[in-house]
Amino acid sequence: EDTLLVINNHLESFKIGDSDVKAYQEIIDSPNDKKNAVGIRKLVKKLAEGTVIRAQQVDTIASIASRFKGKGVIVCGDFNDSPVSYAHRVFNETLQDAFVQSGNGFGFSYVQHQMYFRIDHILISEGMQSYECTVDDSMKGSDHYPIWCYVSWK
């Protein structure tokens, strides 16, 4: 009998608000302006806090998923983290990135405030294959575009 574990998640965000976006834009526009120091410290603090909480969440999810090694596992959702993050590195020990397997382009799922990130992911067991992994940028109901794909057993 086949087993499939699906873990759909929304990992901790950086809680970047409008004032943070404004500070970020000012830093980009005038990187050497000393008055940006407060904005930089505030952004770094938010990034650090979000990263610590998300790492704990990732460790918990990875522990649960590891109990199903050799079975079908799909971990998907809003990771609020890029493909070069701690989250991705931990999950990639046992799972494969469906977008890398069968997607095209950059796969940006978050496109706001002149920021472009691939932070929504579908990760699958090694015994599975993804097809036509797509970020659907025609869907405008959220600040994220949905990512979807077909998955089959190898």
Question: Model-found features: residue ranges?
Answer:
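Low-complexity, intrinsically disordered or weakly predicted helical/coil tracts enriched
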Residues: 27-39, 64, 98, 103
